[in-house]
A protein has these predicted regions:
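Glycan-recognition and catalytic cores of secretory/periplasmic carbohydrate-active enzymes
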Residues: 21-390
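N-terminal hydrophobic alpha-helix used for membrane targeting or insertion
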Residues: 6, 19-21
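Sec-dependent N-terminal signal peptides
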Residues: 4-13
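C-terminal motif of bacterial Sec signal peptides marking the signal peptidase cleavage site
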Residues: 15-17
């Protein structure tokens, strides 16, 4: 295994050096080492799956815990495989990525929440960018139309969940900003401008109702579907309703950076910058946030998933603005995640890359464990960094 890893690092380093020649905070050699590890770990994960399962996290005994294909994270594993393929161009990984992507085709027959954006855009979207596959294109357009059908013109937002609890009538979470990319992709591929309009309307309404004056975001806004009135603002997965749940802030940063890329609407850029500048003031020196920015505990758990999402978004925002501070924070976060404290060794961590993710601490679900979406956005951030022109 050690010989295989050394040979793979050498090949990937050659490919990376052709892509970038200037010295940067994260070297081509470091990038190649991570992607070699990723290839090894993800082959290991692939071997443990069935036709109806995807990696989710690890069990208490360290063994792999899988999910069914309906789980909101099901698109992250195939999407991560496409990033590994994009960096190293392994045909074996390409085959594996397409196999895992096509497992998600049954999702087109379901429309029970907003997560079809995560599920399809991260998998079929990445596949289409790299292969131009016609089936992937068709899936993206159909998926976008299903997502758009969840829009209520009265509320001006896409409903997140169909299940109701705690007095919810029409719950919308900040995570939903991420699903808008599927709408923008679907609009571009189909020429259906209505899909893009739905995305813009949701982004505008979220900007109005989800954020506090300091640019921190609530997790959930509950609307009256008949009047559009805001009934409550909550932070379901955070420390308190008025706290800044870290992954929610990451979704906000990423979502508005993406919407600016897709629309060039300066309002979205201003919103992304507001969130980014707030984070620069509140993140710790190593860039890895506590699971909630307002958890007062000195030993509050860190959430590597929030850091990975932020790093990817900071890189994109730095390219939109030319602001060096955003790139420097992304570099700091990535370098920290590449240390042994956070990055697994070959064969460990159930096959996942990153350790110390926090899923839903209030519900004591997936706490201080690897998470598929942490790996996905970590690899995306590294690919974005690799392709970034210095």
């Amino acid at each position: 295994m050690k010989k295989w890893l050394i040979m793979s690092v050498g090949l990937l380093l050659c490919l990376a050096s052709c892509q970038q020649g200037e010295k940067r905070a994260i070297s081509d050699e470091q990038l190649a080492e991570v992607f070699t590890l990723a290839k090894y770990q993800y082959v290991m994960l692939d071997q443990q799956l069935t036709d109806s399962t995807m990696p989710r996290t690890v069990q208490a005994d360290g063994s792999l815990r899988t999910s069914d294909l309906n789980w909101w994270c099901s698109g992250f594993f195939p999407g991560a495989l496409w990033y590994i393929y994009e960096f190293g161009h392994s045909q074996n990984i390409s085959y594996m990525a397409m196999k895992q992507t096509q497992k998600l085709l049954p999702l087109l027959d379901m429309n029970t929440d907003h997560d079809i954006g995560f599920q399809l855009n991260c998998s079929f979207g990445n596949a289409y960018k790299l292969t131009g596959n016609d089936l992937c294109r068709e899936v993206l357009v159909e998926g976008a139309r299903k997502l758009a059908a969840r829009m209520n013109p009265t509320t001006g937002v896409i409903r997140s969940w169909d299940f109701l609890r705690k007095g919810w009538k029409y719950p919308v979470i900040i995570d939903n900003m991420m699903n808008l990319e599927l709408l923008m992709v679907g609009a571009q591929l189909s020429g259906d401008v209505e899909l893009g309009l739905v995305a813009r309307t949701h982004a505008d309404t979220t900007m109005k109702n989800h954020f506090r004056p300091d640019y921190t975001s609530y997790h959930l806004v509950n609307y009256d579907p008949e009047t559009g009135e805001v009934l409550s603002r909550e932070t379901v997965q955070g420390y308190a309703d008025e706290s800044a749940w870290s992954r929610g802030q990451a979704w906000a940063l990423y979502g508005y950076s993406m919407m600016y890329r897709e629309t060039r609407d300066e309002r979205y850029l201003a919103q992304a910058r507001g969130v980014a500048d707030m984070l620069l003031k509140r993140l710790p020196e190593d860039g890895i946030p506590a699971w909630d920015l307002d958890d007062p505990s000195a030993d509050a758990l860190r959430d590597v998933s929030a850091a990975a999402i932020m790093a990817s978004a900071f890189i994109e925002l730095s390219e939109h603005t030319g602001e060096a501070a955003y790139m420097h924070m992304a570099e700091r976060q990535l370098l920290t995640m590449m240390t042994p404290e956070y990055l697994a060794k070959p064969g460990e961590n159930g096959g996942f890359l990153l350790k110390h993710g926090v899923g839903n601490l209030p519900e004591k679900s997936e706490v201080d464990v690897p998470l598929s979406y942490a790996d996905y956005y970590f690899l995306e951030a590294l690919v974005r960094y690799w392709k970034h022109e210095v």
